[in-house]
């Protein structure tokens, strides 16, 4: 046997073991978030934060200033090209083909 070729040592870890470890980490992270929320609720900090956060008429948490545009009818796209442009292009190719055929 050639001793220079490394041999792999089998492990007992599988893909599902890695998934389980990841899920455990996520659950423990969420538990930490819930602990912080509970600590804020017990000291009244959550109520103070809620009182300081303005509530808008529409229930949004922040004001969004977006430019207001009138609704335009959506143009049908075929492979990212407007359908009208595509039809005119194919029509032009058809006319060109008929003209070339007539010149034979």
UniProtKB/Swiss-Prot annotation:
Keywords: Capsid inner membrane protein, Membrane, Transmembrane, Transmembrane helix, Virion. It is found in: Virion membrane. It is a single-pass membrane protein. InterPro entries: PM2_P3-like. GO terms for cellular component: membrane; viral inner membrane; virion membrane. Signal peptide: none annotated. The chain crosses the membrane at residues 77-99. Its main location: virion. Homodimer. This is Protein P3. It comes from Pseudoalteromonas phage PM2 (Bacteriophage PM2). The lineage of its organism: Viruses, Varidnaviria, Bamfordvirae, Preplasmiviricota, Tectiliviricetes. The gene is III.
């Amino acid at each position: 046997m050639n001793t220079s070729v490394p041999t792999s040592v089998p492990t007992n870890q599988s893909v599902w073991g890695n998934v389980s470890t990841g899920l455990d980490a996520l659950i423990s992270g969420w538990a930490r978030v819930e602990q912080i929320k509970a600590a804020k609720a017990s000291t009244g900090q959550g109520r103070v934060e809620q009182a300081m956060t303005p509530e808008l008429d529409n229930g949004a948490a922040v004001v969004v200033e977006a430019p207001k545009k009138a609704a335009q009818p959506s143009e049908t796209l075929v492979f990212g090209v407007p359908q009208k442009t595509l039809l005119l292009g194919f029509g032009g190719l058809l006319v060109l083909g008929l003209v070339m055929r007539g010149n034979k």
